[in-house]
Amino acid sequence: MCLSFTGPPPATRRILPNTSAGVCGRDAADVSPDGLCEGRDVALFGCSAWGTDEVELQTDFEPLFEAFDRIGVKGVKTACFASGDSSFEHFCGAVDVIEARLNELGGIQILEGLKLDGNLSSNGSDVEDWANRLLAAL
């Protein structure tokens, strides 16, 4: 099994620190979208979001998101996570936007997205719980 993980590299170690599965961590800013998910069992996508009137994806994630039709996600299990600020109208809206697009392209959502108020470090128990549920869903 290989988990393809697209998000900030430090997040890879925090989300799935103790899995024996092969984890292929990639920074969204550094990947080519072409076939990114092909041959993968699971693809995880992490992206911060902000914006008061509408969801704004993290700037370095936007080019990848705009090319999602080329990532080859059809039939691949997917899950998403984001950190954000709960005072914003669209709290962690990146999760909703990314999940919707992956589902539209034939990805198989296996778990409700993780939405964290603040950062991964300050939400350790929530991250651990989500990671355990993710691994159980595989």
Question: Can you annotate each of these PLM segments?
Answer:
Residues 3, 7-27, 34-138:
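FMN-binding flavodoxin-like domain, especially the glycine-rich phosphate-binding loop
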